[in-house]
């Protein structure tokens, strides 16, 4: 089958396969990294992905509807409840990103974390965020209703190496002025170590190497085929011309 394809055609196939391997998903990145914010908080969403030379525009979606905004970042200066929902983006050289959920809450305190599902051994960071960054004192973090950490001044709570026992419902409490305020409870899940997937053993560079090796083998095979045919044609011509000399053993 390979001999039916010209080198140009094979190179086109290799190029197409390489481009397909190169086409990756864009990614929405939140700054700050919290996906739960309070009303009036500022949020910047950035679209990370491959951009064509000279074109850094991006397409944005909010809850499935196109946002009339083409910049690589999308800013929400003062979040409102209607800003909640799923956000997606796409660059000129990438597939559409997976959706990222943004939740806009009302209240005095809000528990924040970079994510809510962790692997065993991960560091868990919890933040007791106040509306308009008002001063909070005597902050306490709770897991399943039990106090886990207390700070006289508002500070983040870190769990260095998460285990399954750290899964549960968390909230924070603190004093704003002379009022004792509490955040809503949020569930945190700690999963076991991830199982290696097949894709782990077939990284992106492996796919490119596969196409290159295939092309190289084709070139070698084609060269041998041409050389053998040329030698056979030469031998047949010499035989017809009577130039072949037979040697007999002693």
UniProtKB/Swiss-Prot annotation:
The Ig-like C2-type domain, residue ranges: 32-105, 120-189
Signal peptide boundaries: 1-20
Pfam family, one: Ig_2
Sites carrying sugar chains: 63, 133, 180, 187
Sequence ranges on the Cytoplasmic membrane side: 229-250
Bilayer topology term: Single-pass membrane protein
Spans within the Extracellular topological domain: 21-207
Tree of life domain: Eukaryota
PROSITE patterns listed in its UniProt record: IG_LIKE
SS bond partners: 47-89, 128-172
Assembly and binders: Forms a heterooligomeric complex with ITAM-containing signaling subunits FCER1G. Interacts (via transmembrane domain) with signaling subunits; this interaction is a prerequisite for receptor complex expression on the cell surface and intracellular signal transduction. Binds the Fc region of antigen-complexed IgG.
Function: Receptor for the invariable Fc fragment of immunoglobulin gamma (IgG). Optimally activated upon binding of clustered antigen-IgG complexes displayed on cell surfaces, triggers lysis of antibody-coated cells, a process known as antibody-dependent cellular cytotoxicity (ADCC). Does not bind free monomeric IgG, thus avoiding inappropriate effector cell activation in the absence of antigenic trigger. Mediates IgG effector functions on natural killer (NK) cells.
Protein name per Swiss-Prot or TrEMBL: Low affinity immunoglobulin gamma Fc region receptor III-A
Organism annotation: Felis catus (Cat)
Upper taxonomic lineage: Eukaryota, Metazoa, Chordata, Craniata, Vertebrata
